[in-house]
Swiss-Prot record:
Protein name: DNA-directed RNA polymerase subunit Rpo3
A cellular component annotation (GO) from this entry: DNA-directed RNA polymerase complex
Species for this entry: Sulfurisphaera tokodaii (strain DSM 16993 / JCM 10545 / NBRC 100140 / 7) (Sulfolobus tokodaii)
Cofactor or coenzyme needed: [3Fe-4S] cluster
Principal location class: cytoplasm
Entry's cofactor comment: Binds 1 [3Fe-4S] cluster.
């Protein structure tokens, strides 16, 4: 199989990709970072803020909170139409509201769960993200607008925390060397009856730390035309959706190039 599943968790996906050019696999990785849109706070209107944080700092914190974006991709207009929208912006924005205060003699930590949105499909991915600590008689009241955006605009619009392509490793043990078991940072090797063996080959990152101590007993190489693609989502989208949308973005760019060349 050219593509097979290595592992899958809630927000993480690892694929083994074979017989595809490295350039193509890396393009999908880059597109996952830069060209898959997600919802994020774009503008904040402060009504009241006497908290310890300036408006700009508080707005930045709000912008970096990931929001669920799966349904937004299907129902909101794309970034190309909304990034600089001044008129006829229907379908561009969702709104979020915050109105929290502390009474006399108390302190209140404001969390992402205190944000109220006008679209139930667009909510913070976690309600436990701290925003600001309010002291006695301090209050924050604001309204913010969210829109779809690309990671190339700002990292707040990037759906991934990790997007990595690495070579698929091949590890071969030619002789016994217990030191490799001790120094390998990835747990590639195991020991059984005093003998070294390869326990988890795919975990090898080709760092060659083991070879420093066991130069003639261990051989490490990268398998030709075989790679490991790892995607970890921040939670706005499932990793599978990120890869699908990354592929779509590449196809759109290729179609744009085709039209440009045909028009020459």
């Amino acid at each position: 199989m050219p593509i097979s599943l290595l592992s899958k968790e809630n927000n993480s996906l690892k694929l083994i990709v074979g017989n595809y050019p490295l350039e193509l696999v890396n393009s999908i990785r880059r597109a996952s970072i830069l060209y898959v849109p997600v919802m994020a706070v774009d503008e904040v209107y402060f009504i009241e803020n006497n908290s310890p944080l300036y408006d700009e700092i508080l707005a930045h914190r709000l912008a970096m909170i990931p929001f669920s974006s799966d349904e937004a991709l299907d129902h909101y207009r794309p970034p190309e139409e909304c990034a600089e929208c001044k008129e006829n912006c229907d379908g561009c924005y969702a709104r979020v509201y915050l109105d929290v205060g502390a009474n006399e003699g108390e302190t209140v930590m404001v969390y992402s769960r205190d944000l109220k949105t006008d679209d139930p499909a667009i909510v913070p991915i976690s309600g436990n993200i701290p925003i600001v600590l309010l002291g006695p008689k301090q209050k924050v009241t604001l309204e913010a607008r969210l829109r779809l955006g690309y990671g190339k605009e700002h990292i707040k619009f990037s759906p991934v925390s990790i997007a990595v392509v690495r070579y698929y490793p091949h590890v071969e043990v030619k002789g016994n060397c217990e030191k490799a078991f001790e120094v390998c940072p990835e747990g590639v090797f195991g020991m059984e009856n005093g003998k070294l063996f390869v326990k988890n080959e795919v975990a090898c990152t080709l760092c060659e730390e083991c070879i420093k101590y066991c130069e003639n007993n261990i051989f490490i190489s990268a398998v030709e035309n075989k790679y490991i693609l790892e995607i970890e989502s921040v939670g706005s989208l499932k990793p599978e959706r990120i890869l699908i949308e990354a592929g779509k973005s590449l196809l759109r760019k290729l179609n744009q190039l085709k039209k440009l060349v045909e028009g020459l």
